[in-house]
Amino acid sequence: MSVRLVLAKGREKSLLRRHPWVFSGAVARMEGKASLGETIDIVDHQGKWLARGAYSPASQIRARVWTFDLSESIDIAFFSRRLQQAQKWRDWLAQKDGLDSYRLIAGESDGLPGITIDRFGNFLVLQLLSAGAEYQRAALISALQTLYPECAIYDRSDVAVRKKEGMELTQGLVTGELPPALLPIEEHGMKLLVDIQHGHKTGYYLDQRDSRLATRRYVENKRVLNCFSYTGGFAVSALMGGCNQVVSVDTSQEALDIARQNVELNKLDLSKAEFVRDDVFKLLRTYRDRGEKFDVIVMDPPKFVENKSQLMGACRGYKDINMLAIQLLNEGGILLTFSCSGLMTSDLFQKIIADAAIDAGRDVQFIEQFRQAADHPVIATYPEGLYLKGFACRVIVM
């Protein structure tokens, strides 16, 4: 008999709507013993079967659902089916947009909670973020090897969230050859170098692909400030869009060095690109105090909020940094501003920008809205999957 997680009375509603998480407060009891990440059955208070998921006793998310199909086992065949289903959409996108790199698995939205897989050419970069994902590591890798024999697999599960579920951080080659120090990929006509082994996340922010392309429409003959530039994707796109100058700011000299290489790799005019190692908050104040002005500012900060207790502080951070950006823009200038914090809703983020404009003594018009690229889908039953949001704002004086 399988181990069963029994829900408290009335706590089955989210599962009936096919939401993939069971929180600790919804659990009445466990029937049997399960190890970390083991597959269990989830039933309502009367014993009616609801779902099959992975057990995580140390997490607030006590179980993550693998399947709502009673007849479906969690095995190599299960992972193969999920991977093949996800690949169909990525194949279409890759063909339409000319991509050689994309997010293959976007966790819950692809029916594989806690699993992220990015494909960069013939390298699959894996992040296992939950106990259940780690427990199923061997089955997942077996499925990947069968479906993608041409690909090497590299593990970047060196993510702090694993500690919340009682797991160590892991990183290293799984199968195949080690990725090069810098792997060239292609995106909307750009060549970009990706550091799979040591870069942020899996090496590159694929989710901002469409936003980088959209930037080009605003930058012709403009002076651009690219904040939190990382390896310069927005800077390269701005140069391809015909900007007069782009200033890229980041605290990492290693990232800025790659950004410079990316400009050179695309045979763009390096004299139009400036790379500044500095704290963005500090530098924006310095620019303001000495009267610097820009026509376009890209504001793409790291996640400011990890949990609800940090949300108020994050709101202040987003407000301050956008206020400074708005102050630096010429009249008619464009602010392209983003938040990758899942707890920050689009409505709240828009309100923060509006408040920032008031504090800056300017008016802004919202002219375009952004979200994560289409290889990062959001399944309807898991709205939390929409984490990246952004706006193009035009600064005016009424």
Curated annotation (Swiss-Prot):
SMART domains, per the entry: PUA (SM00359)
GO cellular component: cytoplasm
Domain PUA intervals: 2-79
Keywords: Cytoplasm, Methyltransferase, RNA-binding, rRNA processing, S-adenosyl-L-methionine, Transferase
UniProt entry tagged with the keyword RNA-binding: yes
Record EC number: 2.1.1.191
Pfam families: Methyltrans_SAM, PUA_3
Main location (coarse class): cytoplasm
Gene3D superfamilies associated with the record: PUA domain, RNA methyltransferase domain (HRMD) like, Vaccinia Virus protein VP39
Known catalytic reactions: cytidine(1962) in 23S rRNA + S-adenosyl-L-methionine = 5-methylcytidine(1962) in 23S rRNA + S-adenosyl-L-homocysteine + H(+)
Cell compartments where the protein resides: Cytoplasm
PANTHER family referenced in this protein's UniProt entry, alphabetically: RIBOSOMAL RNA LARGE SUBUNIT METHYLTRANSFERASE, S-ADENOSYLMETHIONINE-DEPENDENT METHYLTRANSFERASE DOMAIN-CONTAINING PROTEIN
Descriptive protein name: Ribosomal RNA large subunit methyltransferase I
Organism: Shigella dysenteriae serotype 1 (strain Sd197)
Name of the gene this protein is made from: rlmI
